From Swiss-Prot:
Residue span of region Involved in interaction with MAGI1: 1363-1582
Region feature (N-terminal stalk following vasculostatin-120 cleavage which is not required for signaling activity): 927-943
Gene: Adgrb1
Taxonomic classification: Eukaryota, Metazoa, Chordata, Craniata, Vertebrata
Ranges annotated as biased composition (Basic and acidic residues): 1468-1484, 1491-1520
Residues in compartment: Extracellular: 34-948, 1002-1008, 1074-1093, 1158-1166
Name of protein: Adhesion G protein-coupled receptor B1
GO annotation terms (biological process): cell surface receptor signaling pathway; defense response to Gram-negative bacterium; engulfment of apoptotic cell; innate immune response; muscle organ development; negative regulation of angiogenesis; negative regulation of endothelial cell migration; negative regulation of protein catabolic process
Signal peptide span: 1-33
Length: 1582
């Protein structure tokens, strides 16, 4: 009865716990078996989301699997701890180290690397069967058991399973929360801890280091069957709550049964009621523990008590059960003997029963066989009715003594505290010990371990770096194919490195081929081929594709199914021919035919990546046309490389690695952006790079420096350069990229303000934006104004900023007093110079009329108590309806707002007009602000494609007048050819070119390349016009000072007029790289950056130098000893007056031109330019054409020439019909002579004639040489006389000519160059003596060369000359032979008519004529009489009437013939008659102008002679002999002997200063087309 009543208690307690364990075990088995099976080879089991489970090695690691693992995942290592209990196999492992157990943090699948690996092989020791149980505690993410190598064939049982004696172990796992663990989990964990510590020893420490549960003491028998009975929430030791160690101490003491104190145990649970109804009885008991060492110590009180139960009356059918029980007596049994009878939670209750009771039973045997014990007796109360009760106890106890001495068993003392961990880092050991009190009187020794050991792990060891190491290779997997060729592989894992060690090197997987046997291969369809082309491109067609059957092989089955299939295609409507864009070759790319609405794509150029897109669209008439291609997806290689480098740095920053090289990336991007962007995709790429840089700055990866901040802002400025305008327009096609720019700058201000600790104020001024950053505390903050005092701007556009921003100090208040004391605010203000033109807000009627200003405050305030004040200066005049707008991406579309505003909104800002040029905006939020204005009806800001009418009129009038002047000069160039004329024509060309470029520049503002070229050339021609004015002044100065001598001066004029402007422009373009040449509004130098000084500076210098030269020329004109030549003085005065008038007018013209070009809205500047430009053209024509006397005379002569040509008086012609051309000199002489054709020539004196064409004054040093040297004689004429003409010497004295009536001197031109005429006869000696005696006289003699038109001169028949002068017109030439008949009293000796050998001095002619035959003996010489005295009577030109066809030997000169065409005699007669009454006084006025002509022609002839020297083969051929009937004077060419009057030994003559020296012609290699006729046309004998 007593055992039956006590049994239900423990069963009721254990039933729920056993049920829970059973369910969890089955759940774990089901989860584990879901992923594995006997047939799988690669078996992996992952357990997660479970808190308790069980598995066996045979289920998880099947025998035929090559590599298996079991993994338990911790839900959260910070909140849960994993515990494992392993029941080892009874026999040791056949393969040691086959199964490994470890924990790790994570596993990288790509590299097969375990991170944070910690092995538990040392803790579990699965192959050590000496400890049947092993426990471990894991705190990382994963706990894994993995079989490293498969079992060998000898290890497998008969069914291929693990033998139970080797590797058949079982595992229980438990997941316990670190805080407030569950009661059931703590019960199981405490049992595990108890078993772990019970079996722990030095060789096998306990693997459970600590528990979150408060384990309580209780009866611990078999850990697997004896549940712990909780006694409270904590474990007590000496009255203090402790941990699991205290609980384990109590458990051990209770298990030994030797308590230190006696007394009653707690009451057991109430037993079963004796009756179902009508009142029954329940009882409960308790146990008395005797006090050790106290003799006779017992417990006072009853051992058992009862109470009534089921008091309900029984019904008619009710039954009452009556059972009898005997009361238990108190004994001294040990606790273990009571077993499950020991109950708890009992409460005393009065016994009830019948008044009559039975008698006491006999006393029981003494409870102790030795020493003091207890005896008990009991009685029963017999109930007779329900109203009576038994009085008194039902059981009694008494002490009893036994004479035998009781044995005292050994007892354990308290456990010592746990020792310190044996290792300060890594895995170590802790232990504790206890002392056993020795047994006495044959007692039993102490049971249980004397020492307990467990693992400990305080911290990770920070030792040296540990490199990652590979685990062993797994075995080769089963061949992937059961037959034919297959693959096998094996893998290995890497234990991750620690403390910065190196990664595992090598591959984690290896593969190899395997072949088992040939397999029968069925036929298998290959993949479908791609669909073929549609049968029609539109209107409905079909496509076909097919597949190929591979096989069958080795007896396999054939392929099943169709081999090809069809589908419909091309259902769209066919486009009409006019709806297709034709193939086009545009931008060096061939664009194929594309239907309208589609986009064609081609690869970007080689220097970029991506695609060029071009859309085909329909116009309003439905005709397809190509749109311009877009390069929005093209990114240059340099920008792409920078973008990839930045992304790599950002990836490192996100992983927390140290950063290096960020500053170099920013510097490289700055250098690339300064060179400009090639494509619109470069802009988007740069924004992406800057965005990534901002993210890098935000992290601890890299701290930006002030240089990085400056480079960052400069890069943004480079993006906003004018040359990127068209690329920004393309970039807007992919979305509003302006908001990305605003967001980028805002994030940059935030990052820089808070990442740079030493930052207070920062100003960054660039060409296109100004950035201001202020960092200030909230406490004591004042109003912030932009720009601040002490503005340090360097750019021209930002030196005097017209836009202002005021941020009230109320913005810097957070509303919390504590926060305001420590808060720091960053205020960023950005002023964009030209961003408004990139935002596509400019329309036909509206325009962004201000710069764009962005204001940022970090951290952003909740609201603005005081509005933000922004003052804008208007950019355009003539606008109305100024409206403040702000950038608001969150603002929805408003019905009242125009659709073109986009994210711009006018809500939140109030407009306050200040004046006509300024507007104030009061805004209640922080954003980006600007002003939108309405254009007036007559104004539009669109780019005009044609210049204004005013500019066209001004440039046209000026250019036409100057062009007319150039045409006039060209038409009369042979009359007015001079250096001054050359300078004037160059000056006019520079002005005409400037006017044309001004008009072209007005139409090319959108074409960047053309506009830049126009600006550069306009700069060049503006400067050249100033330089040519300076050149004219310089020429005048050199003329008045007499230094205008050589052709080198002319080259200097060209260098000054064209070279100096070209040098200035080249230097400007080189230094600026063409930046500043052209802007978005005009094709001229930018007004900012200082490039305009490249024009203003040189122009001002030219004006200053011109003034200085003008002053010097003026002083020369007004001084007494200044210019004596009246003509030169007049020219110098005209040049000075021209400079004084033209130069100021030129400066005003170009100044107004610059203003008109740069400000196209101003009509005043355009009108001023038109007036000044037109006036300049008229003034230049007036000064240099209408008022210039030379031009007037030249025009008159030109008109006369045209009239004469119309009348047929052409001045002679060749025999073959070609017109004979006059030289410039002949024409000028003819011009000067025509005005006096019918005058009396009697007044013309010999001195006048000879002094007209005298040689220009020589330099002083040459004059001195001539004065010291011997007087010139006829014996040594200048060599160039025979080559070109007879040119008078200024040093020849002209005395009265002697009367030689019977002698004549005939000079004929020979083809050989540099002929010398040498005479030693008496007549020449006489002439020499006469000339030397008359040297002191002032008259100069000259050789006069008459023009070609002298054939029309009319002779004066009435003139009777004193001297017999015969003028013989030579046939074929215009050479006039003047001969004087000698008197009879003046005998002369005629030299033989033969040519001296050599024909000339050896150093002169380059080609020697053929050797002549032996000459005849010379005739006897006659003495020369003294010459008669010549009176200074004016000679007259007489006409002999017929030419001297056969000059006799008395001619006195060796004549040479020329093989040229014969001139008509009638033409010569007409010219003679025309010059009969010539007034040679008029010829003197043209002498100065013709001096240079003579020099140039002389150089030409000299150069031709040198050419003949260089090519001897061409001139050494003998001339073809002509028949006598064609040439009357052929006999003159017959060779003769050397005459007696020619000196046989010629001494070398010193070069005469009168001889014109040869100067290299402009092009040395050019062939000068001069024939004999051209040379002879210039010679005339006087």
């Amino acid at each position: 009865m007593r055992g039956q009543a006590a049994a239900p208690g423990p069963i009721w307690i254990l039933a729920p716990l056993l049920l829970l364990l059973l369910l969890l075990g089955r759940w774990a088995r089901a989860a584990s078996g879901a992923d594995i099976g006997p047939g799988t080879e690669q078996c992996t089991t992952l357990v997660q989301g479970k808190f308790f489970g069980y598995f066996s090695a045979a289920a998880v690691f099947p025998a035929n699997a090559s590599r298996c693992s079991w993994t338990l995942r911790n839900p959260d290592p910070r909140r849960y701890t994993l515990y494992m209990k392993v029941a080892k196999a009874p026999a040791p492992c056949s393969g040691p180290g086959r199964v490994r157990t470890y924990q790790f943090d994570s596993f990288l699948e790509s590299t097969r690397t375990y991170l944070g690996v910690e092995s538990f092989d040392e803790v579990l020791r699965l192959c050590d069967s000496s400890a049947p149980l092993a426990f471990l505690q894991a705190s990382k993410q994963f706990l894994q058991m993995q079989r490293q190598q498969p079992p060998q064939d000898g290890d497998l049982g008969p069914q291929g399973e693990f033998p139970s004696s080797s590797d058949d172990f079982s595992v229980e796992y438990l997941v316990v929360g670190n805080r407030n663990p569950s009661h059931a989990a703590c019960q199981m964990l405490c049992r595990w801890l108890d078993a772990c510590l019970a079996g722990s020893r030095s060789s096998h420490p306990c693997g459970i280091m600590q528990t979150p549960c408060a384990c309580l003491g209780g009866d611990v028998g078999d850990p697997a069957s004896s549940p712990l009975v909780p006694r409270g929430d904590v474990c007590l030791r000496d009255g203090v709550a402790g941990g699991p160690e205290n609980c384990l101490t109590s458990l051990t003491q209770d298990r030994g049964g030797h308590g230190s104190a006696g007394g009653w145990k707690l009451w057991s649970l109430w037993g079963e009621c004796t009756r179902d109804c009508g009142g029954g009885l329940q009882t409960r008991t308790r146990t008395c523990l005797p006090t050790l060492g106290v003799e006779g110590g017992g417990c006072e009180g009853v051992l058992e008590e009862g109470r009534l139960c089921n008091r309900k009356a029984c019904g008619p059918t009710g039954r009452s059960s009556s059972r009898s029980q005997s009361l238990r007596s108190t004994d001294a049994r040990r606790r273990e003997e009571f077993g499950d009878e020991l109950q708890q939670f009992g409460f005393p209750s009065p016994q009830t029963g019948d008044p009559a009771a039975e008698e006491w039973s006999p006393w029981s045997v003494c409870s102790s066989t030795c020493g003091e014990g207890w005896q008990t007796r009991t009685r029963f109360c017999v109930s007779s009715s329900y109203s009576t009760q038994c009085s008194g106890p039902l059981r009694e106890q008494r002490l009893c003594n036994n004479s035998a001495v009781c044995p005292v068993h050994g007892a354990w003392d308290e456990w010592s505290p746990w020792s310190l961990c044996s290792s300060t880092c890594g895995r170590g050991f802790r232990d504790r010990t206890r002392t056993c009190r020795p047994p006495q009187f044959g007692g039993n020794p102490c049971e249980g371990p004397e020492k307990q050991t467990k693992f400990c792990n305080i911290a990770l060891c920070p030792g040296r770096a540990v490199d990652g190491n590979w685990n062993e290779w797994s075995s080769w997997s089963t061949c992937s194919a059961s037959c034919s060729q297959g693959r096998q592989q094996r893998t290995r894992e890497c234990n991750g490195p620690s403390y910065g060690g190196a990664e595992c090197q090598g591959h984690w997987v290896e593969t190899r081929d395997c072949f088992l046997q040939q397999c029968p291969v069925d036929g298998k369809w290959q993949a479908w081929a791609s669909w073929g082309s549609c049968s029609v491109t539109c209107g409905g067609g079909s496509q076909r594709r097919e597949r190929v059957c591979s096989g069958p092989f080795f007896g396999g089955a054939a392929c099943q199914g169709p081999q090809d299939e069809y589908r419909q295609c091309g259902a769209q409507r066919c486009p009409e021919p006019h709806e297709i864009c034709d193939e086009d070759n545009f931008g060096a790319v061939v664009w194929k035919e594309t239907p309208a609405g589609e986009v064609a794509a081609v690869r970007c150029p080689r220097n970029a990546t991506g695609l060029i897109l071009r859309r085909c669209e329909l116009d309003e008439e439905g005709i397809a046309f190509w749109e311009p291609p877009t390069y929005i997806r093209c990114v240059s290689i340099d920008y792409r490389n920078i973008q990839m480098m930045t992304r790599e740095h950002l990836a490192k920053a996100q992983r927390g690695l140290p950063g290096e090289g960020v500053s170099e990336v920013i510097q490289t991007l700055l250098e690339i952006s300064q060179d400009g962007t090639s494509y619109s995709g470069d802009l988007l790429s740069t924004i992406d790079v800057l965005r990534n840089m901002t993210e890098i700055f935000r992290r601890a990866y890299y701290s930006p420096t002030p240089g990085d901040v400056q480079n960052f802002v400069q890069i943004i400025s480079n993006l906003l350069a004018e040359e990127n305008r068209d690329k920004w327009e393309e970039a807007q096609l992919m979305g509003p990229n302006a908001k990305e720019l605003f967001r980028l700058v805002e994030d940059f201000v935030d990052v820089i303000g808070f990442r740079m600790k030493d930052l207070r104020d920062a100003y960054q001024v660039t060409d296109n934006l100004v950035l201001s950053i202020h960092k200030l505390p909230a406490s004591g903050a004042t109003d912030i104004s932009f720009p601040m005092k002490g503005w340090r701007a360097t750019g021209d556009w930002a030196k005097v900023p017209e836009d202002r921003v005021t941020v009230s100090k109320s913005v810097f208040s957070t509303g919390l007093a504590e926060a305001d004391d420590s808060s720091v605010f960053v205020v960023g203000t950005v002023l964009y110079r030209n961003l408004g033109s990139f935002l596509a807000l400019q329309r036909n009627t509206t325009v962004l009329n201000s710069k764009v200003i962005s204001v940022t405050v970090k951290p952003p305030p909740r609201s603005l108590l005081t509005p933000l004040e922004i003052e804008f200066a208007h950019m355009y005049n003539g606008t109305t309806n100024q409206t403040c707008i702000l950038w608001d991406e969150t603002d929805g579309p408003s019905s009242s707002a125009p659709p073109q505003l986009g994210p711009w909104s006018w809500r939140g800002c109030r407009t306050v007009p200040l004046d006509a040029l300024r507007t104030r905006c009061l805004c209640d939020r922080l954003s980006t602000f600007a002003i939108l204005a309405q254009l007036s009806a007559d104004a539009t800001m669109d780019k005009v494609t044609v210049p204004s009418v005013t500019l066209i009129v001004g440039c046209g009038v000026s250019s036409l007048t100057l062009l007319m002047l150039v045409i006039i000069y060209v038409s009369v160039w042979r009359y007015i050819r001079s250096e001054r004329s050359v300078i004037l024509i160059n000056f006019c060309l520079s002005i005409i070119s400037s006017n044309a470029l001004i008009l072209i520049g007005q139409t090319q503002t959108r074409n960047k390349v053309v506009c830049t070229l126009v600006a550069a050339f306009l700069h060049f021609f503006f400067l050249s016009s100033f330089c040519w004015v300076l050149t004219e002044a310089w020429q005048s100065y050199m003329a008045v000072t007499g230094r205008l001598r050589s052709r080198l001066v002319r080259k200097r004029f060209l260098c000054l007029g064209w070279g100096l402007p070209a040098l200035v422009v080249a230097i400007s373009v080189g230094f600026t790289k063409a930046k500043g040449y052209s802007t978005m509004n005009y094709c001229w130098l930018s007004l900012e950056g200082g490039l305009l000084y490249a024009f203003v500076g040189p122009a001002a210098a030219v004006v200053l130098v011109n003034m200085v030269i003008g002053i010097l020329v003026f002083n020369k004109l007004v001084s007494k000893d200044g210019i004596t030549d009246k003509k030169l003085k007049e020219r110098a005065g005209a040049s000075l007056w021209s400079s004084c008038v033209v130069l100021p007018l030129l400066a005003l013209t170009w100044m107004s031109a610059v203003l008109a070009v740069t400000d196209r809205r101003s009509a005043l500047f355009q009108i001023l330019f038109a007036v000044f430009d037109s006036l300049e053209g008229f003034v230049i024509v007036m000064v240099h054409c209408i008022l210039r006397r030379e031009v007037q005379d030249a025009v008159k002569c030109r008109v006369v020439d045209r009239q004469e040509e119309g009348n047929g008086d052409s001045g002679g012609s060749f025999q073959n019909g070609h017109a004979q051309l006059m030289t410039d000199f002949e024409k000028d002489v003819d011009l000067a002579c025509r005005s006096v054709l019918n005058k009396d020539i009697a007044a013309c004196r010999t001195a006048t004639i000879t002094g007209t064409f005298k040689r220009p004054s020589l330099p002083e040093e040459e004059k001195m040489k001539l004065a010291k040297g011997p007087p010139p004689t006829f014996n040594s004429l200048p060599a160039n006389v025979s080559k070109l003409h007879l040119h008078g010497s200024p040093r020849y004295p002209g005395g009265p000519l002697p009367d030689f009536p019977n002698h004549s001197l005939t000079l004929k031109k020979d083809k050989a160059p540099k002929s010398s005429f040498i005479g030693d006869g008496d007549i020449f000696k006489k002439l020499d003596s006469e000339l030397s005696r008359a040297q002191e006289k002032a008259l100069d003699t000259s050789y006069v060369i008459l023009p070609t038109a002298t054939a029309t001169l009319r002779p004066k028949p009435k003139e009777e000359p004193k001297y017999s002068i015969n003028i013989d017109q030579m046939p074929q030439t215009r050479l006039i032979h003047l001969s004087m008949a000698p008197d009879a009293s003046f005998p002369t000796r005629s030299p033989p008519a033969r040519e001296p050998p050599g024909g000339a001095p050896p150093e002169v002619p380059p080609v020697q004529p053929p050797p002549p035959p032996p000459p005849p003996p010379p005739p006897p010489q006659q003495p020369i009489p003294p010459p008669p005295t010549l009176e200074p009577a004016p000679p007259s030109l007489g006409d002999t009437g017929e030419p001297a066809a056969h000059p006799g030997p008395s001619s006195g000169a060796g004549a040479k013939n020329e093989n040229v065409a014969t001139l008509s005699v009638s033409s010569l007669e007409r010219r003679k008659s025309r010059y009969a009454e010539l007034d040679f006084e008029k010829i003197m006025h043209t002498r100065k102008r013709h001096q240079d002509m003579f020099q140039d022609l002389n150089r030409k002839l000299q150069h031709a002679a040198e050419k003949e020297k260089e090519v001897p083969g061409a001139d050494s051929k003998p001339e073809k002999q002509q028949t006598p009937n064609k040439r009357a004077w052929e006999s003159l060419r017959k060779p003769h002997g050397t005459p007696a009057w020619v000196k046989k030994e010629l001494e070398p003559l010193p070069p005469s200063p009168l001889e014109l020296r040869s100067v290299e012609w402009e092009k040395a290699g050019a062939t000068i087309p001069l024939v004999g006729q051209d040379i002879i046309d210039l010679q005339t004998e006087v």
